Amino acid sequence: MKKNKLSKNQHRRIQAHHQYRLHPTSLTDDKNNQLDDAQFGEPQQGVVISRFGQHADVEGHQGQQQRCHIRRNVLSLVTGDRVIWRPGIPRQENRNVKGIVEAVHERKSVLTRPDFYDGIKPMAANIDQIVIVSAVIPDLSLNMIDRYLVVSESLNIKPLLLLNKIDLLTPNERKKINLRLNIYRNIHYTVLEVSAQTGEGIADLQANLLDRVSIFSGQSGVGKSSLLNTLLPPTEQQILVEALSEKSALGQHTTTTSRLYHFQQGGDLIDSPGIREFGLWHLTQEQIIQGFIEFRDYVGHCKFRDCAHIDDPCCALRDAVQKGHIAKERFDNYHQILSEITLKGKKLFNQD
């Protein structure tokens, strides 16, 4: 069912009210809100740990967590959002108290994906790094890696490429895999090889997660849950296990709600179900081509301005591929992704 759109005046009123609530003095701005004040403590900074419909779990500056109501003027709230919230005050007759989210700070980044029903849907906010997890089982897919890289570049979020399950490789197989991954090393992406089973490479991974908010992406079966259990402290592991067991014991598509976890050595993780498969149909052709960073030196140098980089004469990109300056695998993946977004059509999504 199509949602009713807000008018420009409604948007302005909501935004003004929202900005007003970012200041603590605004929390008793009318008589109706005075009833709320008796139920809630002082306003404080917090971060959204998880979102559940009209409620959210929020963590305060001292590490305390509480499920919260969300003010109606808060139009968008996702895991990772920095908020102004007020904890609920416990009462003897009602121990199941909830706090309230009053306002959301401006996001420094937001990870989105296209959705047939809701247009462009936010999944997580304030991310510093997308960890692209691949494995030798199932087969290593460079096309999937390139899709995640396009998203990372379009959002200006640092990507980290991670190959898991390397303990399953023979020395010769590992050498062949490394030749494929050198495509990314050669264009200055960081590539790590790890094993959640043996612990190889985990220390390097922990160093790359330090003091950052990361989100793990990748197909089912690449071992993300095993990695997280290796990285997370026991208290967070238990939360993760409970979240997984609610859905399935099979280890496939088991995360149903985005959640923020804390690494013991420092840094945070957002685990999100929507990150597993990316649709890129909401991106423009320009965003797609800019997502292939090694193309940037050649874009605009073709003979014809409308060059499609397929069989056009004097194509700078094709010439770079032939000279070995651009990997053919990446060039082929670019055309495959571009064909996909052309087929699906940007018109399917409302970005207003």
UniProtKB/Swiss-Prot annotation:
Classify the source by domain of life: Bacteria
Query: What Gene3D superfamilies does the record tag this protein with?
Result: Nucleic acid-binding proteins, P-loop containing nucleotide triphosphate hydrolases, Probable gtpase engc, domain 3
Relay the cofactor remark from the entry: Binds 1 zinc ion per subunit.
Tell me which EC number(s) this protein carries.
3.6.1.-
Q: Where is the composition biased (Basic residues)?
A: 1-21
Q: Enzyme group, top EC level?
A: hydrolase
Please list the GO biological process terms of this entry.
ribosomal small subunit biogenesis
Q: Where is this region: Disordered?
A: 1-38
The cofactor(s) it depends on are: Zn(2+)
Where on this chain does GTP bind? N164, K165, I166, D167, G218, Q219, S220, G221, V222, G223, K224, S225, S226
Main localization of the protein? cytoplasm
Which Pfam family is an annotated match for this chain, by its short name? RsgA_GTPase
- Its function? One of several proteins that assist in the late maturation steps of the functional core of the 30S ribosomal subunit. Helps release RbfA from mature subunits. May play a role in the assembly of ribosomal proteins into the subunit. Circularly permuted GTPase that catalyzes slow GTP hydrolysis, GTPase activity is stimulated by the 30S ribosomal subunit.
Organism equals Hamiltonella defensa subsp. Acyrthosiphon pisum (strain 5AT)
Q: Where in the cell is it found?
A: Cytoplasm
Q: Which GO terms describe its molecular function?
A: GTP binding; GTPase activity; metal ion binding; rRNA binding
Listed A to Z, the keywords are:
Cytoplasm, GTP-binding, Hydrolase, Metal-binding, Nucleotide-binding, Ribosome biogenesis, RNA-binding, rRNA-binding, Zinc
* InterPro entries for the chain: G_CP_dom, NA-bd_OB-fold, P-loop_NTPase, Ribosome_biogen_GTPase_RsgA, RsgA_GTPase_dom
What name does the UniProt record give this protein? Small ribosomal subunit biogenesis GTPase RsgA
Q: Where Zn(2+) is bound, by residue?
A: C302, C307, H309, C315
Tell me the lineage of the source organism.
Bacteria, Pseudomonadati, Pseudomonadota, Gammaproteobacteria, Enterobacterales
Name the gene behind this protein: rsgA
**Where does the CP-type G domain start and stop, copy by copy?**
116-278
Q: Is Chaperone among the key words of this record?
A: no
Q: Which GO terms describe its cellular component?
A: cytoplasm
Subunit and partners: Monomer. Associates with 30S ribosomal subunit, binds 16S rRNA.
